[in-house]
């Protein structure tokens, strides 16, 4: 499904490639990111460059994403995380008020902790000045070490087997 196509609300599974580019800058392509809509859940796989913008272009507010899955930690799969995470908290991004679920291979905790440290002052100022709810920046982390296995640790009624 391309970004310009309307969604079929009767579909059980909709996959949208938000970015298929590489680390090399290309004005026509964003970096790696895939949106999966399944069983009324919005699942995001990787956060390449431009992911938040592509979500908005696809008609999805970043705050609508229920869970984020990192496949691995190459820059073209992660560089858009800060923009997506903090942008989903802002009113223009949907105003996230609940924690974001994030899963990934070993190392996901360090990735998230680094972002929390890097943006601590920004978060503090937005809470104080814009009265944004701090809960919208919270992240629930699940790490795994099994190669080729995808799962959603927060919703037991949705299994995501790798194929």
Task: List the predicted regions and their residue ranges.
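Binuclear metal-dependent hydrolase catalytic cores
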Residues: 1-163
